[in-house]
């Protein structure tokens, strides 16, 4: 279902968007400076989270979101839902292209490169920091 798919990529997308030095896209001059981290911290503070700085509040927000997902029994990875790895990797390029071309992508606070979208999908499938070397090598090869 759509909601579970959103939950599986949510934390990865939030972390991606919160980067303090994103690649600036010339076609989007309205993004004068990155302020997404501050906005996410504002959300965290509005629900009672505190911290020494925006980064700390943001990390606590991610923790709370993960706790919520655990409470409602959302698994941590796409793989845990039984999606076949071979099938996932065979369809990864198509999914990446569809995400890049989605009408909502242009409204994202950080305009992604296709390689970055692919990385988000890989993290959502394997889990943060668990992408096998074969997945990384394939990505690097395709970027050239």
Predicted features and spans:
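Proteins with a high burden of low-complexity, intrinsically disordered sequence enriched in S/T/G/P/A and R
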Residues: 1, 78, 136-139
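Gly/Pro-rich interdomain helix-loop hinge
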Residues: 3-90, 130-131
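Short, amphipathic C-terminal "tail helix"
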Residues: 87-144
């Amino acid at each position: 279902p759509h909601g579970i798919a959103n939950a599986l990529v949510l934390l990865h997308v939030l972390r991606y968007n919160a980067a303090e030095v994103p690649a600036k896209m010339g076609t989007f001059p309205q993004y004068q400076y990155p302020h997404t981290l501050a906005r996410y911290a504002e959300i965290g503070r509005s629900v009672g989270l505190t911290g020494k700085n925006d980064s700390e509040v943001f990390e606590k927000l991610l923790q709370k979101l993960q706790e919520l997902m655990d409470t409602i029994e959302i698994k941590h990875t796409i793989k845990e839902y039984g999606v076949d790895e071979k099938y996932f990797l065979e369809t990864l390029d198509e999914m990446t292209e569809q995400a890049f071309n989605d009408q909502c992508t242009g409204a994202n606070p950080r305009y992604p490169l296709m390689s970055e979208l692919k990385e988000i999908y890989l993290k959502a499938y394997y889990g943060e920091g668990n992408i096998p070397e074969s997945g990384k090598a394939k990505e690097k090869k395709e970027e050239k």
